[in-house]
């Protein structure tokens, strides 16, 4: 076995070392090469650095995405000339969809940490393009961000799942529960980007009530660029992680040629689409993308802005982010396997169904304080649904597809982004009520198919590496 112990503290072989420690060291998972022999302090260090990496990853994503999330929320109300804002977002997610097809291969070649670092550059460039928004700045930035987003999200899912599996093995914990905990922490912190980013937006644009006005946006985007830079720097402190399985190690080895890699990628994508479990998850993945695009493009434009003005976008999305974060944390803590995931997803979908029905019935409260509270209430329910879906889908994929983690997370992003792109391109062509009907229909369909998955898999326990060892 190769030794990489120097990364975590040098641990020398000693003749008197306890044989049980040798056995424990050799049983550690393949995503991190480990020394054959270790002392107690070295072993304890290995047990703790996985959680440290999750803390760093979560905070870095918060800093990067609080800027991008706020900029994205403003596109449909700020860059309104020739629908530049929504069109650029449509191009972004179309690019995201196409690049997600090869994202798993890119992440395997680069490694998950390098993919995360390169991925941040696209978000910085996109926010910078908003300093002078036009077709020649936003469109190229959107295309490049599509590539960067595809690798940063596949890298994130791979990195987080690898850390969870290693942590469960090192501490002899249930793997499914650890994956749920790690995803809960990440998505809870990540969801705060909506809360913090939109509070900053509200503070800097509080005097800006007119749709299409650019007053104060230059300062806003400059502040965001500084914050994103700190997030990118923070990612440099992540520890490198390798492949999760023997097959992935072989693919990323130096002797793996380009043709072999592409062939493996094609087989991986075809295998995922022929897997009944993945086919049963795809409708729910598609709905998760649809509901995100609805919040960014439709809810802010047709519900929030007419009721409380463009400055209300910041406060309503802050409420959305707050509930998103709280529910992500709670959902992650409660996740232990498919049964708990099914229950939690049911609650999240019900919350969003309530919003869709209220909007379809055109239920509203008179303007003023109660009107504002009603908008914040709707935003909070949407945040609950998003927090549940993001946490549970990532945990579910980590549990069910442990032998091809990159490929499974690539499928997640392909289907999410395809539906998001469709919304940004076609929503302007159909009425708001038609969008609501489509969303409600897909919600019901995806939930029924997801219940079929739960029945198919049954109550089979999540594989736990720790239990096998």
Indicate where each model-derived feature is located.
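C-terminal ends and interior cores of transmembrane alpha-helices
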Residues: 121-135, 347-368, 424
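Extracytoplasmic gate region of multi-pass secondary transporters
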Residues: 68-72, 198, 270, 276-318, ...
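Juxtamembrane intracellular "pre-TM" segments in multi-pass secondary transporters
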Residues: 20, 30-49, 246-279
């Amino acid at each position: 076995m190769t030794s990489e112990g120097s990364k975590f503290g040098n641990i020398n072989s000693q003749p008197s070392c306890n044989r049980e420690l040798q056995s424990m060291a050799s049983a550690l998972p393949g995503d991190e090469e480990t020394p054959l022999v270790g002392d107690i302090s070295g072993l304890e260090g290995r047990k703790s650095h996985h959680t440290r990496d999750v803390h760093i990853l979560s905070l870095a994503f918060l800093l990067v995405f609080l800027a991008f999330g706020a900029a994205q929320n403003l596109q449909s109300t700020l860059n309104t000339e020739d629908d530049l804002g929504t069109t650029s977002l449509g191009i972004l997610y179309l690019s995201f969809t196409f690049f997600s097809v090869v994202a798993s291969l890119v992440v395997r070649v680069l490694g998950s940490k390098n993919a995360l670092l390169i991925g941040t550059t696209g978000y910085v460039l996109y926010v910078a393009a908003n300093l002078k928004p036009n077709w020649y700045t936003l469109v190229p930035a959107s295309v490049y961000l599509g590539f960067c987003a595809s690798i940063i999200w596949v890298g994130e899912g791979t990195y987080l799942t690898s850390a969870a599996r290693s942590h469960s093995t090192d501490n002899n914990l249930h793997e499914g529960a650890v994956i749920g905990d790690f995803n809960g922490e990440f998505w809870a912190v990540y969801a705060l980007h909506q809360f913090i980013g939109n509070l900053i937006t509200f503070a800097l644009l509080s005097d800006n009530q007119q749709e299409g006005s650019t007053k104060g946006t230059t300062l806003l985007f400059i502040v965001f660029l500084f914050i994103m830079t700190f997030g990118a720097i923070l990612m440099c402190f992540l520890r490198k992680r390798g492949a999760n399985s023997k097959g992935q190690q072989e693919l990323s080895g130096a002797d793996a040629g380009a043709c072999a890699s592409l062939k493996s990628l094609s087989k991986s994508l075809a295998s995922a689409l022929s897997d009944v479990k993945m086919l049963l998850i795809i409708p729910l993945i598609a709905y998760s993308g649809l509901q995100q695009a609805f919040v960014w493009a439709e809810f802010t434009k047709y519900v929030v802005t007419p009721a409380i003005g463009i400055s209300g976008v910041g406060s309503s999305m802050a409420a959305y982010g707050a509930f998103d974060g709280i529910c992500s944390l709670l959902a992650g803590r409660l996740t232990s396997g498919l049964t708990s995931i099914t229950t939690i997803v049911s609650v999240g979908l019900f919350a969003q169904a309530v919003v869709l029905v209220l909007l379809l019935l055109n239920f509203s409260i008179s303007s003023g304080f109660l009107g504002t509270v009603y908008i914040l209430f709707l935003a909070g329910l949407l945040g609950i649904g998003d927090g549940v879906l993001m946490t549970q889908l990532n945990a579910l994929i980590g549990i069910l597809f442990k032998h091809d983690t990159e490929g499974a997370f690539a499928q997640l992003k392909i289907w999410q982004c395809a539906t998001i792109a469709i919304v940004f391109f076609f929503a302007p062509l159909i009425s708001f009520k038609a969008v609501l009907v489509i969303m409600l229909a897909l919600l019901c369909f995806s939930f029924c198919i997801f219940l079929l998955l739960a029945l198919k898999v049954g109550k089979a326990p999540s594989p736990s590496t720790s239990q096998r060892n």
